[in-house]
């Protein structure tokens, strides 16, 4: 094998490893931390500010990578299917991605979601929450934020596709 080929293969392997490490990074936030405040445009046409919910209700922030992709479609359909669990627990659900509002409106319409989706097109909120991936979209992460604005539960990666963990966390928060 030529030295050039060995160098090229080594660089490719190192590059792949670097990408895998970056993608595996976890949020820097943890349960008990105050959730960073934000204002984002929603699919309802209104801006949503997290701090407006303080003292009122629990909020579920379901970050997802991209509208119209397999995992994200499954995740948002799951939240819609379980929406009554969140409503019973007094929680407001928001799907958040780095897609623009128009794309999220089409996605929400196609899935017939009753909850708003929020556009983080400038990536600032995803970065604040530590979920922005190097490829420019949010990693799949769900945060349950209580009435006091504190993070009570975090799910990341494949666990965040299912709504059940977040729904159970909302029920626990409601009992406090």
Language model feature labels by segment:
Residues 1-5:
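Positively charged n-region of N-terminal signal peptides that target proteins for export
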Residues 22-51:
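N-terminal "domain-start" segment that seeds a small globular fold
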Residues 35-36, 58-59, 139-141:
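Short loop/turn microsegments at loop-to-beta-strand junctions
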Residues 51-73, 79:
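Short active-site neighborhood of thiol/selenol oxidoreductases, capturing the structured segment around
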Residues 68, 73-111, 122-127:
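Structural microenvironment flanking redox-active thiols in thiol-disulfide oxidoreductases
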Residues 113-115, 133-143:
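Structural micro-motif
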Residues 138-176:
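Thiol-/selenol-based redox modules, centered on thioredoxin-like
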């Amino acid at each position: 094998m030529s030295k050039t080929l060995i160098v090229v293969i080594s660089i490719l392997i190192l590059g792949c490893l670097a990408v895998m490490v970056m993608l595996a990074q976890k949020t820097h936030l943890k349960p008990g931390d105050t959730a960073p405040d934000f204002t984002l445009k929603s699919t309802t046409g209104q801006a949503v500010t997290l701090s407006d919910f303080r003292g009122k209700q629990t909020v579920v922030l379901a970050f997802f990578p991209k509208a119209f992709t397999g995992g994200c479609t499954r995740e948002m359909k799951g939240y819609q299917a379980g929406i009554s669990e969140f409503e019973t627990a007094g929680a407001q659900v928001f799907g958040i991605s780095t897609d623009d509002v128009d794309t999220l409106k089409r996605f929400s319409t196609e899935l017939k979601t009753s909850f708003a989706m929020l556009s983080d097109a400038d990536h600032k909120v995803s970065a604040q929450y530590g979920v922005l991936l190097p490829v420019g979209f949010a990693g799949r992460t769900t945060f349950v934020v209580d009435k006091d604005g504190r993070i009570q539960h975090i799910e990341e990666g494949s666990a965040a596709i299912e709504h059940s963990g977040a729904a159970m966390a909302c029920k626990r928060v409601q009992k406090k």
